[in-house]
Every structure is written in structure tokens, then in C-alpha cells.
């Protein structure tokens, strides 16, 4: 049976795991790392890079390097958070055909789902390389506080990457699964998850294989990227004070500042001070300029204090919704790379009144939990029951623009709820159902998920027709809505597709595009491998020719030299097939040389053996003993 993989599709880094017996195992990528940067680059040569290779070239190609795209997924172009991001990233964020935020590279538009799919493809290939078989099914994690549009867009990304997404699971819930799988005693835990781009807090009751989420809260635009950007701003401001040059308009300099900020942030988790040293950051008429400064942990903490404090309000809300006090939490589990920051650990300790649990790897635990959920769905992991919740209230717009909730936040999913509404005007023959998600009292202040019309209502005074609206949330947290006129039995049912979102045709086109790219990538990889093999063969043949050329005939030597020359010429082109053919030719004509080498080494071995035998002969003096003389 094919394996189901678990993928943590992160803002900054992604991770893939699989069940290995009874345990979840994190899989190393082709670079030997257990996490992969969530970075995609488009080079001037038309090449597409994903992961570490993409991140490495970001400084020289800032506009062609896309990072933190998870912050755009499922968001409209006019979203205030997107506006904020546009000012901070060096790549182009543009308006998609459907009104969503997309990115543009070399004149081509890509949806965030497409970019995410490229990262998912890399994780899929990583798993396939380790398992030695094709992988087609996955469990993918999302922040608990993701809305329906963001969940749907993540599921679309999986489909574009060629994966059947069996389940979308919340990141804190996945972390709790990995943390609590072997724990039999009942516990109430809080999972504090501060990653690269999002913050989640979930309160769960776990014990004896049951994982029940009591409440969840968070902020989908708060994470390590914000901490980095705060430092970038500080570095740029200090440099401007000193040199009078604004680096914020220089995309190349900004990319170098971002890398320096990330490095400084990590170093300050284990040391009190770090030095930022960026030579030749810019230049003016007087010559090149260098950026050098010291940054203390205390200064860094003061710069980001408001960001750290922003995590506390969601914690309070989650506890309130769960009906608990901070002191009633048995264990606080830290998840996400940002929780390595001492200030965050201190704030968590102060709020919950206990030391946070540090026994899980914050970068890997979410992927491990996703793999466990994959095992549960496949039937390999027994006696585990996961009860998650919907993070935001769902409802429709009613008379006066009021938001009428049908499903309250933190309701256990899957769930279904119906309510009967009526018409607002006499003889109204159609109603428009506008579906919203959020916590504000007026519908317009919440996130519009979709709208549809129920038509053909028979003429009647207002308030008489009975229209039953039913919400159905599946285990992925994705919404389906139907409206039915109880008088006529007419029904309209839709699977929510965000007011932007990708249509089935869009997804199909992107799947084809991804498959073509996969074929191109494979072809390119095969070309590189063939080139490497050819160069290695040329090197070894030339070396052998120097050493044993006198052991073959002049004609044979000429054939070998001609084959080497042909292969070198083929390497100057880009035809992989020609390189392979010329390699085979060289291998064939070199057989006589190989034979000569073998015979030569055999002869040398025989000579050595003879010498060894001669060395073993010991000259001895014998004394004749006459037995008779006794």
C-alpha cells in the first residue's frame, strides 16, 4: 500500500514526514537538510529553483525570488495585509484575474497556490526519493486560524502538485498529535505556535488516544517574517542616519539586509550580542559604503516587543472560549522556529505561570503530526480520535446588513447546522444568500466567502416563504452551503469557492503547467547527470590512456582519442541524447584499454606474489644429530 506523507507547508520552511513503523520520521531533502526553505526562484536563464538553491541566489536575484507566499494565499489583492506586504518584498505582487493577490515573474502571473505547489512538489520528490516509490496522497497542515478561502487555496496547491490531499489539518493540532501520541494520562495542553508568518494558539484535552480541541485563536499575519522586517527597517534607518542614503529603495540591498536580519535574530537566541557586517552595501560619488553595527539582544527585544505582546490577546481569547484559566493548563507546548527566542519563552512562562515544554523539535513536530494523521487515515495508526474545531464563526447576511451566525467559532467539526429564513419584501421571487466568516456583528466587516441566488420563489407576502439555509463543514474545515425553498422544494447547493479563488479550469491548467515543468525539470536533471557522467568518463579514460596507452595498438589508441574528442564536442551542446550516445561509443572503444589495464594489474599482482613467496623463504642452519651418541 502506497504511503501517505505528512507535509508542513510553512511560510519560511517546509518539512515532510512519513510513518516508519509506529513512529513518524522526518525525511531529509536532496541537500541533506530536514527542512526546506519555502522559496522559489525564477532565473534569467529560465530555470526554476526551489528550496535551498533558490534561497542561496536571492541576494543576486531579489526580484526573481519569491518567499513567504503563504501570507498571500487565499487573500484578495485589496486586503490591507497584502498592501503591507507589497511595500516589504522585492518581488512583484499583482492583481490576479480573479481579484486575488498573485505574483508576477518575467511577465507571467502565478497564483500563490501555484508557487506553493512548486514547494509541495519538492517535498513530494523528497519523500519519493527516500521511499523509492511514487507518492500520491498527503496530509497538509495549515494555521488553525486560516479561513475557508485560505484552506481551499492550500488544497488547490496540493492538487496542482499532483497530490490527493486526504486531509487539511491545523498546525497546532498536528503538533499535539506528535506530542501526545504516547501519553495515556489525561492532560489539558496549550499549543503556542509562532512560525514564520502566522501565530496560532490551541487548547486541547488529550489522553488515551483522544485529541479534542477545545478552542483555537490566532493571527494569520504575525510571524518571524515580521521580526525580520522590523530589523531590516532598523538597519536601514541607522544607515540613513549615518550615511544619508536610504537603502529601502534598493532591492539588492534590502535582500542583503533581510538575510542579515534573519542571521542576527537566530544568533541572538543563543548570544547576548551579534555584529552585522555588510561590505559594499551601496555606493555614492565618494565611493563604496559598508554597513557595520553591533546589535544586542536587549535592543532586538525592545524593537519587537509589540510583536511579542500581540501573541497574548489570542491566548486570552482561546482560554476564555475553552472556559479555562491559565493555571488549569497542564503543559504548554512550543511550536515554530520563533519560539526559540528567549523573550518569547519568558512571555509564555509569565502568562501561563509555568515553564513551557521544550521536548519537541519546533521545526519538525507539525510535519510529524501530519504523518501520524496520514497513518490514522490509512489505518496504520489505531485508536486515535481527533476532534478539531472551526476557528471562525460562519453565517449569512440578513436584513440591515447584520451578520447572523449559524455556526459559532470553536464548534467541533465535521458539523452541520440549518436555520429557516424568510423574504424581506412582498412577492419577492428570489433571494441572494451571502455567506460570511468572522466575528464582527455587521456582515460587511467579515470575510465574504461566497454568494448565490435561490430563484423561483412563488409570489407571497413578506415573511411567508420558508427558506432553509444549511451549513456543512467537513473535517478539512471547508464549507458547503445549501438553500432550499420549503414550499417548492427548490434547492441550490454550492461548495464554497472563495469570491476570488481558483476555478476547476484554472486548477486543471495549473496542474498541466506543473506536469510540464516537472518533465522539464526531469529533462534538465537528466542532462546534468549525463554531463557529470561524461566528464567523469573523459577524466578516467584520459588518465588510463596516459598510464596504459602503450599497452594498446596505435589504431586503438587513435579510436579512443577520437571518441574522447567527439564526447567533448557533444558536451558543448545541450543534446542529452547525443552525449549519452557518444559516452556509449567511448565506453565501447575503451574496452581494449580496460583489458590492457586488467592484464597489467594481474601481471603486477603475480610479480608481487612471487616476491612475497621469495621473501617467505628462510635460510636455516642445520646441525646433524647423531642419535647413537647418547
From Swiss-Prot:
Source organism superkingdom: Bacteria
InterPro entries membership: ATPase_NBD (IPR043129), Chaperone_DnaK (IPR012725), Heat_shock_70_CS (IPR018181), HSP70_C_sf (IPR029048), HSP70_peptide-bd_sf (IPR029047), Hsp_70_fam (IPR013126)
PROSITE patterns the UniProt entry points to: HSP70_1, HSP70_2, HSP70_3
Modified residues (Phosphothreonine): 198
Record has ATP-binding as a keyword: yes
Gene3D superfamilies: 1.20.1270.10, 3.30.420.40, Actin, Chain A, domain 4, Substrate Binding Domain Of DNAk, Chain A, domain 1
Bias (Acidic residues): 608-624
Keyword terms of this UniProt record: ATP-binding, Chaperone, Nucleotide-binding, Phosphoprotein, Stress response
Region (Disordered): 598-630
Functional note: Acts as a chaperone.
Family: Belongs to the heat shock protein 70 family.
Protein name in UniProt: Chaperone protein DnaK
Taxonomic path: Bacteria, Pseudomonadati, Pseudomonadota, Alphaproteobacteria, Hyphomicrobiales
Gene: dnaK
Amino acid at each position: 500500500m502506497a504511503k501517505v506523507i505528512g507535509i508542513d507547508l510553512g511560510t519560511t520552511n517546509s518539512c515532510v514526514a512519513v510513518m516508519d513503523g509506529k513512529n513518524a520520521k522526518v525525511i531529509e531533502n536532496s541537500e541533506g537538510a530536514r527542512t526546506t526553505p519555502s522559496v522559489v526562484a525564477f532565473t534569467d536563464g529560465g530555470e526554476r529553483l526551489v528550496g535551498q538553491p533558490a534561497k542561496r541566489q536571492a541576494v543576486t536575484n531579489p526580484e526573481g525570488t519569491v518567499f513567504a507566499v503563504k501570507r498571500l494565499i487565499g487573500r484578495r489583492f485589496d486586503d490591507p495585509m497584502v498592501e503591507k506586504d507589497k511595500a516589504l518584498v522585492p518581488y512583484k505582487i499583482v492583481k490576479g484575474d480573479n481579484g486575488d493577490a498573485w505574483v508576477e515573474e518575467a511577465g507571467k502571473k502565478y497564483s500563490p497556490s501555484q508557487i506553493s505547489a512548486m514547494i509541495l512538489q519538492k517535498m513530494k520528490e523528497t519523500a519519493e526519493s527516500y521511499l523509492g516509490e511514487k507518492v500520491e496522497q498527503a496530509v497538509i497542515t495549515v494555521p488553525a486560524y486560516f479561513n475557508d478561502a485560505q484552506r481551499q487555496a492550500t488544497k488547490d496547491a496540493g492538487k496542482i502538485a499532483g497530490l490527493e490531499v486526504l486531509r487539511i489539518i491545523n498546525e497546532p493540532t498536528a503538533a499535539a498529535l506528535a506530542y501526545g501520541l504516547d501519553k495515556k494520562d489525561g492532560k489539558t495542553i496549550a499549543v503556542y505556535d509562532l512560525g514564520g508568518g502566522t501565530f496560532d494558539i490551541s487548547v486541547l484535552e488529550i489522553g488515551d488516544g483522544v485529541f479534542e480541541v477545545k478552542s483555537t485563536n490566532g493571527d494569520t499575519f504575525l510571524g518571524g517574517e515580521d521580526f525580520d522586517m522590523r530589523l531590516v527597517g532598523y538597519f536601514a534607518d541607522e544607515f540613513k542616519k549615518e550615511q544619508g542614503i536610504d537603502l529601502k529603495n534598493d532591492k539588492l540591498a534590502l535582500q542583503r539586509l533581510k538575510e542579515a536580519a534573519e542571521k542576527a535574530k537566530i544568533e541572538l537566541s543563543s548570544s547576548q550580542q551579534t555584529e552585522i557586517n555588510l561590505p559594499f552595501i551601496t555606493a555614492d560619488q565618494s565611493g563604496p559604503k559598508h554597513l557595520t553595527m553591533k546589535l544586542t539582544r536587549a535592543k532586538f527585544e525592545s524593537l519587537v516587543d509589540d510583536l511579542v505582546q500581540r501573541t497574548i490577546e489570542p491566548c486570552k481569547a482561546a482560554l476564555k472560549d475553552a472556559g479555562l484559566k491559565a493555571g488549569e493548563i497542564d503543559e504548554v507546548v512550543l511550536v515554530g522556529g520563533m519560539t526559540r527566542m528567549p523573550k518569547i519563552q519568558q512571555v509564555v512562562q509569565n502568562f501561563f505561570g509555568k515553564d513551557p515544554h521544550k521536548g519537541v523539535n519546533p521545526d519538525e513536530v507539525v510535519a510529524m503530526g501530519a504523518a501520524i494523521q496520514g497513518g490514522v487515515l490509512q489505518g496504520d495508526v489505531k485508536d486515535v480520535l481527533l476532534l478539531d474545531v472551526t476557528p471562525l464563526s460562519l453565517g449569512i447576511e440578513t436584513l440591515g446588513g447584520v451578520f447572523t451566525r449559524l455556526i459559532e467559532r470553536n464548534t467541533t467539526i465535521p458539523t452541520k447546522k440549518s436555520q429557516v429564513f424568510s423574504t424581506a419584501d412582498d412577492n419577492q421571487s428570489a433571494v441572494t444568500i451571502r455567506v460570511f466568516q468572522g466575528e464582527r456583528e455587521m456582515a460587511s466587516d467579515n470575510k465574504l466567502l461566497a454568494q448565490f441566488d435561490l430563484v423561483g420563489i412563488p409570489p407571497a407576502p413578506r415573511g411567508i416563504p420558508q427558506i432553509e439555509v444549511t451549513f456543512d463543514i467537513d473535517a478539512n474545515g471547508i464549507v458547503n452551503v445549501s438553500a432550499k425553498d420549503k414550499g417548492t422544494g427548490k434547492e441550490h447547493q454550492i461548495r464554497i469557492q472563495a469570491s476570488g479563488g481558483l476555478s476547476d479550469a484554472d486548477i486543471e491548467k495549473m496542474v498541466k503547467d506543473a506536469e510540464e515543468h516537472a518533465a522539464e525539470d526531469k529533462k534538465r536533471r537528466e542532462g546534468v547527470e549525463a554531463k557529470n557522467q561524461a566528464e567523469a568518463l573523459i577524466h578516467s579514460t584520459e588518465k588510463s590512456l596516459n598510464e596504459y596507452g602503450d599497452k594498446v595498438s596505435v589504431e586503438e589508441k587513435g579510436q579512443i582519442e577520437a571518441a574522447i574528442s567527439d564526447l567533448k564536442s557533444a558536451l558543448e551542446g545541450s543534446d542529452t541524447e547525443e552525449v549519452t550516445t557518444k559516452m556509449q561509443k567511448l565506453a565501447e572503444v575503451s574496452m581494449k584499454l580496460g583489458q590492457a589495464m586488467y592484464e597489467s594489474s594481474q601481471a603486477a599482482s603475480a610479480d608481487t606474489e612471487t616476491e612475497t613467496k621469495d621473501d617467505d623463504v628462510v635460510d636455516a642452519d642445520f646441525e646433524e644429530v647423531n642419535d647413537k651418541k647418547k
